[in-house]
Amino acid sequence: SGGPLLDSQGRMIGINTIIYSSSGTSSGVGFAVPVSTARRVVGDLINYGKVNRGVMMLSLVQNTSRIANYAGYGIKNGMIVSKVRKGSLAEAAGIRGGNTPVQYGRNTIYLGGDIITAIDGLPIATLADYYSALEDKVPGDTVKVQVYRNRKYLELEIKLETEGTSQNSSSI
């Protein structure tokens, strides 16, 4: 773990992180962080002391069949925008959060807002998809976000920002 992952030409293509092994030995399926991600993360750590990723200042909930049926959504995939931080660039771009509070497990979520279905053309079905689409984005980058609103698909351009930089950076 932590060593370089090399291709057949001896070029580093990743950093090994973990091995899944049923035998407990160093044989099995290995996982690695791509070298492009590692370079950016290391650069951010050196320059800023933290990873500097672009964010949209949203509170999201994964859409499920259960939620979609309850809320009467016409789709059963995507990420529901529960809340949008006041004063954020996402709010300025027109993305809408929900306005109907619903108890979901131990949390209150807000339904009726936009549902994010794609970012820069990449389908968004899960929170992992959402984070993957933003993985290499930095504050100041603009992304094209496809949302489902009132049974229609719309495309919004949202400029990403740094966590806590909105005019009102209180919690979402």
Question: Which residue ranges define each predicted feature?
Answer:
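Short loop-to-beta-strand junctions
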Residues: S23-V29, V51-G54
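C-terminal recognition in membrane/secretory proteostasis and scaffolding
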Residues: D7-S8, M12, T37-I172
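A residue-level detector for well-ordered beta-strand positions
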Residues: G3-P4
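Short, flexible turn/loop "capping" segments at secondary-structure junctions
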Residues: S21-S23, Y73-G74
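Short beta->alpha transition motifs characteristic of CBS
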Residues: N16-I19
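Glycine- and other small-residue-rich loops at beta-strand/loop junctions that grip anionic moieties
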Residues: G30-F31, S82
